[in-house]
Amino acid sequence: MNKLKDDFIKYGLDQYIETFQNFYHDDLKTYEQKLSNLKSLLDAESINNVERFLQLMLKLPLPSKDFMVRVKSVYNQEELFRIQKEQEYKANVINKYYKKYNLEGWEKLEVNVFKYHCGLKRLPKDVKRNLKGKIFIDGGAFWGDSMLMLTRYAPSKIICFEPNTINLNHLSTTIANNGLKNKVEVHKLGLSKNRETALMNFISDQQNHGASVVFSPFKSKQEDILLDSIDNVLKNNAKEIGLVKLDVEGYGVNAIKGAKETIQKYKPVISCAIYHNPEEFFDIAPLIKSYNSNYKFLILPLSEDFILKEITLLAWV
């Protein structure tokens, strides 16, 4: 533990931190109202996670590419203990996952996806059982890590959305290497509320490979991508949608708006990363609630080694 407390960490969440700090300082009244609205939908655990996330977002300095921060200046003792346990867990299991899922060639493995299953482990048992045999949506499929974990819940099919060409090639390899061609449908699309195009920057360093952002000081590559809505893609679908998983790098609100009909018709479980900007963080839960008032929510940190990453909203009826 002593060694861990003295360690420094580098974090690449510059654009995320800045948007939260700007929102807080530019419009405190709206910030407080949105926070109050969000808390009214949550249990005590989620409220605690929300408050801790925002506390860190608002106090951390904006990083540059080589910015380092002392771990003990960021985390409390409980969090430091969790970080140490997470590091031990990763060291013990990472080779197992590489071998089990034929992941040779992956530069960076998101072990947290394999550990937490995008938050699905926290669902009530009856809700998890009810996922079996339904169609799953994997928005922001990356190289296929979340797709691999979703297969453990016995979907009839997984429909993957991934707009980045490099990521899509790796996703196709993961599907082939794991014998999933008949279980997975892939769309080279980003998700939004309408069919449109966008110019995206994809961070290309090894620590952030594949992350898409509007702006970043980190090395990135630009790519024109096509966006569409879940409702448009599924308009001829006749089978029940059981899950909508989204990690769409800041497009979460528009992706949920573009899934309104799907959510109202099928009431799927929703797992959505919400840490990319204030709009995602504060607005997605109330938006889902407006589609169906029976939705329940958890907000969970699904990355122990840096608490600002992978903050996920889990919603179910």
Locate predicted features.
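Phosphate/nucleotide-binding beta-alpha loop and adjacent structural elements of enzyme active sites
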Residues: 1-317
